[in-house]
């Protein structure tokens, strides 16, 4: 019974998803909005239970860790922190989707997939066994594959979903192949037991092969270059609320899995994978920012921006000090609020363009669609401004504080050159973020000019995301402390 209680947040999500799926069958499309509110309530309940368990873990000290179900699941500060990241994204997406799924015939399927995807991500965060880790990865991936192609009549959406599915399937095969090499060398799939037998991997060519395969497998989900090929098309083609879930939530699943597998299980091979992540971090952040400059689709620009942000988080693997790991972990939460909010703001603009049937209907998220947004939809423009400035690292936002912790710890570790590259990339990103702000506030609107009321679900989701960005920026101490406790699971202080 005690083990079940530790999984209460996950069970709440599954129960909510099943209730939504069964209830939706008996509701008319016009009555299905209630399902969005039910999904929101279920997510809020899961957040409450996760926060409560996080408090119990940290009350007794920094090193408290519980393992359940024959030590296949670990309940610790790292798992609970990432569960909060996933649930925060699910909350924002669930609220915004109340408008997106309005009058849809498939509302119940949509919310069930969102909640089941979040459930899979949360299991990945706690996975203490390679087999369970892979199964949870696939559960979340299958749900997001379906969500990416949710608009079956949209050719761009189907193209992005197909690329996501094909490349995702290949990456899953590579990941499973890498995990099998680790099992073959160590004789176990338990992450703690693998860590306790470092001699079985060091000096063994199988260990190097496993690192390469696992980097490719996890790199796909983290959208690290050159494993990013799916991301721009999928983020642009998917419904904006789904893009928010993928960029802000699903990507973090790859990071928490990599934290456990590389830093804990494969600690003996640190010199090898540390070099790989250093190279990937530099290439990813630079490529993402440079290509984002040339984009005219805002969602595609945000996709390449997500590559750059992944490069910043990957710096934690390159530096490998406790503070740098805490900075990378904190950045995942900051990025969740910033990126989810930015995609929801884009969703509001896409709704405005498609409902008015004006502008570029083929690419409704084109930069021209954002012309004069400050006058036409002031709240969406203001929130988008907060998000892009936070992504650029402008104070007093979550992005600034997370970058400050991560970059300063990189300098303290003696890797000043890496910090300089990251700072220059942040400066470059300010160009395309500022260009978007210019379009919203300093360029006249195309077509209609009258003010548009933003739908309540979009407004509520935006305000939740803005609150997260500003609270983390203005009051960072508790978030830094929680991130430090999570980092202690990986590297003892």
UniProtKB/Swiss-Prot annotation:
Family to which the UniProt record says this protein belongs: Belongs to the complex I subunit 2 family.
Organism whose genome encodes this protein: Methanosarcina mazei (strain ATCC BAA-159 / DSM 3647 / Goe1 / Go1 / JCM 11833 / OCM 88)
Subunit structure: The FPO complex is composed of at least 13 different subunits. FpoA, FpoH, FpoJ, FpoK, FpoL, FpoM and FpoN proteins constitute the membrane sector of the complex.
HAMAP family on file: NDH1_NuoN_1
Keyword Nucleus appears in the UniProt entry: no
Biophysicochemical property: temperature dependence: Optimum temperature is 39 degrees Celsius.
Catalytic activity field: methanophenazine + reduced coenzyme F420-(gamma-L-Glu)(n) = dihydromethanophenazine + oxidized coenzyme F420-(gamma-L-Glu)(n) + H(+)
EC code: 1.5.98.3
Signal found in the keyword field: no
Localization of this protein: Cell membrane
Any matching Pfam family: Proton_antipo_M
Enzyme category, top tier: oxidoreductase
Job of this protein: Component of the F(420)H(2) dehydrogenase (FPO complex) which is part of the energy-conserving F(420)H(2):heterodisulfide oxidoreductase system. The membrane-bound electron transfer system of the complex plays an important role in the metabolism of methylotrophic methanogens when the organisms grow on methanol or methylamines. Catalyzes the oxidation of methanophenazine to dihydromethanophenazine. It shuttles electrons from F(420)H(2), via FAD and iron-sulfur (Fe-S) centers, to methanophenazine (an electron carrier in the membrane).
Protein name: F(420)H(2) dehydrogenase subunit N
InterPro entries assigned to the protein according to its UniProt record, in alphabetical order: NADH-Q_OxRdtase_suN/2 (IPR010096), ND/Mrp_TM (IPR001750)
């Amino acid at each position: 019974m005690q083990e079940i209680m530790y999984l209460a947040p996950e069970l709440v999500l599954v129960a909510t998803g099943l209730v939504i799926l069964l209830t939706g069958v008996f509701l008319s499309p016009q009555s299905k909005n209630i399902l969005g509110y039910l999904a929101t309530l279920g997510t809020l309940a899961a957040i409450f239970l996760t926060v409560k368990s996080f408090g119990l873990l940290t009350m007794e000290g920094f090193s408290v860790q519980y393992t359940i179900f024959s030590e296949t699941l670990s309940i610790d500060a790292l798992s609970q922190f990432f569960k909060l990241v996933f649930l925060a994204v699910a909350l924002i997406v669930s609220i915004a989707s109340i408008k997106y799924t309005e009058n849809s015939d498939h509302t119940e399927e949509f919310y069930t997939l969102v909640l089941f995807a979040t459930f899979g991500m949360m299991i990945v965060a706690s996975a203490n066994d390679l087999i369970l880790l892979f199964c949870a990865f696939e559960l979340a991936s299958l749900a997001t594959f379906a969500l990416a192609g949710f608009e079956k009549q949209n050719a761009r959406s189907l193209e992005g979903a197909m690329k996501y599915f094909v490349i995702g399937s290949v990456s899953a095969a590579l990941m499973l192949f890498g995990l099998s090499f680790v099992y073959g060398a160590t004789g176990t799939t338990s992450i703690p037991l693998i860590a306790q037998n470092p001699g079985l991997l060091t000096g063994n060519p199988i260990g190097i092969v496993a690192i390469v395969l696992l980097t490719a497998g996890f790199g796909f989900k983290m959208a690290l270059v050159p494993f990013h090929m799916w991301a721009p098309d999928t983020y642009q083609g998917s419904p904006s609320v789904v893009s928010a879930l993928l960029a802000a939530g699903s990507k973090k699943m790859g990071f928490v899995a990599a934290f456990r597998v590389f830093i804990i299980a494969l600690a003996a091979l640190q010199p090898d994978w540390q070099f790989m992540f250093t190279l990937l971090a530099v290439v990813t952040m630079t490529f993402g920012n440079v290509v984002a400059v040339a984009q005219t689709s805002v969602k595609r620009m945000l996709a390449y921006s997500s590559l750059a942000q992944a490069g910043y988080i990957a710096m934690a693997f390159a530096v490998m000090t406790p503070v740098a790991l805490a900075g990378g972990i904190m950045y995942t939460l900051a990025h969740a609020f910033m990126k989810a909010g930015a995609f929801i703001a884009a969703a509001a603009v896409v709704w405005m363009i498609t409902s008015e049937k004006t502008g570029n209907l083929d690419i409704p998220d084109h930069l021209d669609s954002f012309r004069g947004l400050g006058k036409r939809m002031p709240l969406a423009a203001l929130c988008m401004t907060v998000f892009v400035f936070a992504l650029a690292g402008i104070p007093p936002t979550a992005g600034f504080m997370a970058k400050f912790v991560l970059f300063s710890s990189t300098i303290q570790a003696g890797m000043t050159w890496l910090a300089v590259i990251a700072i220059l990339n942040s400066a470059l990103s300010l160009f395309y973020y500022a260009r978007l702000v210019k379009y919203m506030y300093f360029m006249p609107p195309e077509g209609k000019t009258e003010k548009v009321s933003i739908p309540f679900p979009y407004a509520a989701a935006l305000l939740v995301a803005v609150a997260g960005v500003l609270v983390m920026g203005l009051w960072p101490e508790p978030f830094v402390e929680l991130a430090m406790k999570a980092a202690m699971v990986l590297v003892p202080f």
